[in-house]
Amino acid sequence: MSKQTPSAAEPLLTIDQLHVQLPKGSERTYAVENVSYTLAPQEILCVVGESGSGKSLTARAIMGLLPEPHVHYEKGQILFQGEDLTKASPNRLRQVRGGEISMIFQEPMTALNPVMRIGNQIDEVIRFHVKKSKRERQQLALSLLEDVQLPDPPRILKAYPHELSGGQRQRAMIAMALALEPKILIADEPTTALDVTTQAQILVLIKELQAKHNTGVLFITHDFGVVADIADRVAVMQHGKIVEIGSADSVLNHPTHPYTQALTRAVPSLIPRSVKPVEDNPILEVKSIVKTYRSGGGWFGMGAPEKEVHACDNVTVSLNEGETLGIVGESGSGKSTLARCIVRLLDTDSGEIVYRGQDLCKLDRAGMRPLRS
């Protein structure tokens, strides 16, 4: 394992030879084995590795959120500003969580309470840790939503999680995590479920807020594109162990461990590869399809004006036999609607979908059934 680059600042967090044990009969003894690293103020340390490598369990151990008794801490130290959190009382850990160390989870829809308004959830975090009047808490909540660049903060305060987009829910989670200006922010794959445009915005936001609040960020991910964007240092985990750690430049551009080298080689390149020519023999042709979603209008046209969303507007694509066609775009661009129209889960407003010379738009359910099976 390469040596860890020392930080000029005194570490906020020091993980020293941490061991987290798995239940008997598991494939390996430890979920986390002999893990050591530090995190300094204003530093972003990215922890990367495939699923099951121990990234998230290390973070949960820091927060005192291991799924005990089946998965439990065995030995090692977790030093937060010199205090060993493995020896902290449950009451002390509750003070640390949210107040001094906060966490952003991968899927805010499961982390947020679905039956509580966003404002009430932020208020709950503030009320638990500090003494402020209701008006002061409300002003702080509004300020936090402004900081994470959510539109119309008063409306967001009154909204339920399901009424927000995925990116808005993640921003609300970040607002909650930063409510008490924690010294450490743990981000557990917070952009995985987001489209690339929203992901880029969230990464910029985390960097801006980190600099503003002098926060150390422990960023857990499997995406080397994210690592290249934000990391100061990188720790690579495999089978519960750190196999390589160093500056982002050294790990990404000059990896020394075979596993890290394999991970970096697996990152798709934007340089076009030499590909086998594909004959111009379309197996599928989508010709000028239109699909519009309509909502509103109320009963007998007495409600709000009808709204129209043009999900697919004159879309034309073709797919040759033996060819792979990639369709990309941000959330709401019409990718999934196009796919659903092709398999006739949605009816198009106009256009043709021709498969092997047959227009699928003219087939009934019985005619489509053998094509779907």
Language model regions located:
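Conserved ABC transporter NBD signature motif
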Residues: H72-D84, G351-D359
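Helix-to-loop junction immediately C-terminal to a conserved catalytic motif
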Residues: M63, V343
